[in-house]
From Swiss-Prot:
It holds the Pfam family Euplotes_phero. The keyword Secreted applies. Mating ciliate pheromones (or gamones) are diffusible extracellular communication signals that distinguish different intraspecific classes of cells commonly referred to as 'mating types'. They prepare the latter for conjugation by changing their cell surface properties. GO terms for molecular function: pheromone activity. This is Mating pheromone 2. Residues 1-16 form the signal peptide.
Amino acid sequence: MKAIFIILAILMVTQAFKMTSKVNTKLQSQIQSKFQSKNKLASTFQTSSQLKDSCLNDPEQRFYITGCSNNPVCGDAFDCSATGDDEEKCDAVGQNVIDLFYYFWGTCVNDYASCIMFAATTYNMYSGPENCGCINQVSYADWLDYFDCPSFSG
């Protein structure tokens, strides 16, 4: 009887890892496809610090970065239940964050510090129980890896 429970436990853990890996891979591939021409984008959007500052200081622009879950521009993508871990909704949130990041590429998110700030803020929206609660979908370390912030410092 114990052997059956042990086997069932192993199967459950294995399945959980497979599901998490599948979601992580999907989100990573979405980000990679968005930024496959990242170097071209980086050279195209050479913006002044004045433009960057206006993005971060203008309340309307800042709202996109820090308060997107309340912004109508985001539509249903942040319409997640407080219980979280709804795979379809978590994927929608992930895609919405990627789209926002792409939109701000080279303006608000154009150096290492702003990239880290954006990644941390969006992960809080993605994983926070008061927002989407998608914590079991993607870890914070993976989230940071996807945004590849160190590439901005070179």
